[in-house]
């Protein structure tokens, strides 16, 4: 049966446009949806969200510093920001839970007593081989210069949540939760000229 002549005609400009849009829509429909930064692997009625949260890094630098310059094994690293986390996880009855606990994902200060301003940030990394974990960085922020890494703490873990606060002496406190005793205090050792973790009082 011969094909009708109308079907053999070369599509005009409008027809080509429609075909092009249709192809783009089909490609978009077939493309996988972008993964959310936070996914929950559990029941919120039974566990706190930061316990069951898994974070999926999607950036390749932190404050302009390539991830693989922070650690050679890293391919991705994304610092935590409130705008990346669903509001319903961070707020309870309209109250910012982190703010109420004096916690933050980034804190500025002069943590080693030097003149340049510094910023501490926490986030999630992913190694090129696949494993993920959480990190804490302290970066120098010289006026008019590029940030420079002063301290790195990174741990492979399936529970990547982390937050920061300051103790009454102005020392940085790293939290692995929002309502628990899981924290570590970072201090500047003047004699050794380096940062280090204070001993856990429960282990002494």
Model-derived features: where do they sit?
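Short, surface-exposed beta-strand/strand-loop-strand elements in extracellular ectodomains
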Residues: 133-139
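Repeat-based blade/solenoid architectures
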Residues: 91-105, 153-165
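Bacterial N-terminal signal peptides
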Residues: 16-28
């Amino acid at each position: 049966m011969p094909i009708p002549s109308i079907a053999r005609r070369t599509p005009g400009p409008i027809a080509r446009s429609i075909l092009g849009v249709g192809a783009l829509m089909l490609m978009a429909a077939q493309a996988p949806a972008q993964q959310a930064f936070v996914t929950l692997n559990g029941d919120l009625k039974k566990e706190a969200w930061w316990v069951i949260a898994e974070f999926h890094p999607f950036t390749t630098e932190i404050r302009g510093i390539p991830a693989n310059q922070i650690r050679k094994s890293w391919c991705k690293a994304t610092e935590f920001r409130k705008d990346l986390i669903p509001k319903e996880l961070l707020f309870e009855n309209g109250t910012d839970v982190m703010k109420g606990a004096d916690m933050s994902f980034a804190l500025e200060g002069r943590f080693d007593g030097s003149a340049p301003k510094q910023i501490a940030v926490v986030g999630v990394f992913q190694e090129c081989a696949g494993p993920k974990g959480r990190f804490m960085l302290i970066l120098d922020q010289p006026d008019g210069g590029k940030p420079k890494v002063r301290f790195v703490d990174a741990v492979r873990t399936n529970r990547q949540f982390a937050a920061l606060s300051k103790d009454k002496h102005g020392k940085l406190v790293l939290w692995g939760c929002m309502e628990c005793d899981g924290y570590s205090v970072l201090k500047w050792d003047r004699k050794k000229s380096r940062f280090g973790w204070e001993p856990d009082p429960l282990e002494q």
